[in-house]
Structure formats: C-alpha cells, structure tokens
A protein has these predicted regions:
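Active-site and adjacent substrate-binding regions of carbohydrate-active enzymes
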Residues: 1-332, 337-362
Length: 362
C-alpha cells in the first residue's frame, strides 16, 4: 500500500456540546463554513497522529502518503490539512469548482500556489471525480445551470463545446507544476450521463430525495462504467453481463478501442500530454501567472513554467477563453495543443504549450 485517500477529511470532529442545527437541508448540510461538524480545528490532531503512524512505515526511498478529500472554503483553509506534519497532499476542489472564466482561473491558480507554498506543500489539480458532473459536460452548461453536483435535470449542453473545453482545461491542468489527479473515463472525454432511468439509478442521494420538494438526481451520471470496446457497450465488458449503470449509445464512439491509435482522439491527447509532462519535468517546475497587461488578454490564462531544462519561463501555458483567436508570439513554438493542427494561432476554447523558438522539444 502506497498510501491512503482520507474520505471526508474535514468531518472527523464535531463542535463541543454537539449543538443542534436549526435548519438543515441537503444544501446547508454540506456547507463547510457554517455547520458544526465540518472543518473543526480539532481534526488536525487526528491527522498528526495518523501521520506519525505513516512515517513509521516509511523510508527515504518508499514513503507512505495520505491525501485529504476535504471540501473546505476559503482556499486558505485547505492549506491547514497539508502542513508538514499532516497530509502530504489535498485535492484542490477550489480549482475543480472554478467556472470556465479566465479571470476566475487565473485567480484560483495563483491562490492555489500561494496557500500551498506557505506550508511547503505541493499544489494539486483536479477537474473531475466520482461526486461531480464530468467536466466534459459541466464546462458547457448554461450559466444559470452551471453547477458542480447534479441536483435536478439540466439542459443537455452542446457536446462539441463541452469536449473542446474539457480538452482545453485538461491541457491547462497538465501543464501546471504540482500533482495532477485524473478520474477514470475523463481520458476518453466521457460526458455526464444525464438521462439514466429512475429504475436504473443507484446513488442513495436520489432515493433519499426522490419525492421531496428538492429532489436530486445524484452522482450516477459520472459513475457509469467506462467503455473498453465499442462492440460491448451496454455490457460489463464481457458482451453478456449488463453494467451496474446503463451505458448510452454515444459511449461506443468513445470506447478505448475506437480511440487508441487515433492521434486526434482525447485518449491519445492525454497520453501525449502525460508523456511530454514527464519529459519536460513540468510537475517539478515553478509557475508564475503574469498580469494580463491589456484588455486584449483579459480572456487569456497564461502561466509561465520554469523547469530545470527550460530555464526561466521556458514553457508558456496559454488557454484562450475569449471570442477571437490568439496569435502565438513570434519567439514561441507550439509543442502541445488541446486541438489538432494548431501552429500560429490559438483558437477559442483551446490551450497550447509553447516553448521558446529553437528549443529541442519533441
């Protein structure tokens, strides 16, 4: 065992006296800033004890680690969980929660580095998990329906827009120094399954709220099994057994065997980005988020990454969230892009990695 993910890490301690909650709905019950059972200071002593146990099983060459799943706000609070004698890392849900907006993304990236650097902890990045709407759907939702968790029916967003933004968001995330966490199926560009029949649902959230004045569809839509073979969609992968949640027909086109070897596929994009991330040493680099400088760059997210082999700001990560194409600077060359065929101009909803012209990067 290499380590442990601590579920609901912010919920181990209750307020003294176990006070009643006057009004409790599903919304307020999960609010980390106001409930007497979330993010209490006493939780940290528990993790200090656990850390000592983990360290007793660790060596310099083989560390046992602990990762916190803690939904806390504001972002400064998460740094308390990754102090040197507590967790090694914590999921960055502030990043996951951020809408598709350049200013908001610049702020959360800068703040993430600020709070984690203050406690000498690695910054982490995550876009999807088993509790939230898959980002290939979430990032294309209309503003009035934009949400992390699926409470009720939403309008099916444009899948092309959603996948384009998801690929751009992933390319941005995998260019950032720190640790990146991937959720199964995102490498295939899977959308949230929004139309699971009621009699096929499994999430207790659905059954607990069904028939109430605030019904919730729950998390089943992001938990549908991934499609390995296009010919075996609607089975558990053996061609015979029904999956525990039904797979939609669109999953056939997104199956692993359909995407493998297709250089334009989302699966091959993930593989190429992860390979280049390792080769460039981006995870171990340092980042700087420059000021936009002009109104023309207001819809651009730019991050300068310094690595051992590529010097000060040697790799520039640029995401274009605006309405117009963004010209690649004359002294830079595209070494990775969330869309195929990008060379001199970055399209809308696209992210590129740029090296200095003449750099030996393949």
């Amino acid at each position: 065992v290499d380590g442990f993910r601590v579920d609901v890490a912010h919920g181990m301690i209750k307020a003294p006296g176990l006070p009643d909650v006057e009004v409790c709905t599903d919304d307020t019950a999960m609010a980390s800033t106001s409930m007497p059972y979330w993010d209490r200071d006493g939780v940290h002593e528990i993790y200090r004890r656990w850390r000592r146990i983990l360290d007793s099983y660790s060596t310099d060459a083989d560390t046992r680690i602990m990762v916190a799943e803690a939904w806390v706000q504001p972002i400064d609070r998460i740094a308390r969980y990754v102090r040197p004698d507590e967790h090694h890392q914590a999921f960055n849900f502030s990043f996951l929660d951020t809408r598709w907006d350049a200013a908001a993304l610049r702020e959360v990236i800068s703040e993430s580095y600020r709070v984690n650097d203050a406690v000498n902890a690695p910054t982490t990045w995550v876009l999807s998990n088993h509790d939230v709407i898959r980002h290939a759907t979430r990032l294309a939702l209309a503003p009035e329906e934009a949400t992390t968790q699926l409470a009720g029916p939403v309008t099916e967003p444009d899948r092309t827009v959603g996948l384009g933004r998801a690929r751009a968001a992933t390319t941005l995330m995998l260019g950032l120094p720190g640790s990146a966490y991937l959720y199964q199926g995102e490498e295939l560009g899977l959308p949230e399954v929004l139309d699971i029949p009621d009699d096929k649902r499994q999430d207790p959230t659905f059954f607990r709220t069904h028939g109430t004045d605030k019904p919730e569809l729950g998390r089943d839509g992001c938990r549908v099994p991934i499609p390995w073979s296009a010919d075996e969609v609607a089975t558990a992968g053996d061609g015979r057994t029904p999956p525990w949640l039904p797979q939609p027909a669109v999953f056939a086109d997104l199956a692993v065997d359909r995407q493998t070897g297709d250089a334009t596929s989302t699966l091959e994009l993930y593989r190429s980005l992860l390979r280049l991330r390792r080769e460039l040493g981006l995870a171990d680099g340092t980042a700087r988020v420059p000021d936009t400088g002009t109104d023309a760059d207001a819809d651009i997210v730019a991050v300068e990454v310094t690595t051992a082999d590529h010097g000060d700001g040697g790799v520039l990560i640029v995401a274009n969230l605006g309405a117009d194409n963004w010209p690649v600077p004359a002294n830079r060359q595209v070494i990775a892009a969330s869309r195929p065929g990008v060379t001199t101009s970055v399209p809308v909803d696209c992210t590129v990695w740029l090296a200095r012209l003449g750099s030996q990067v393949e």
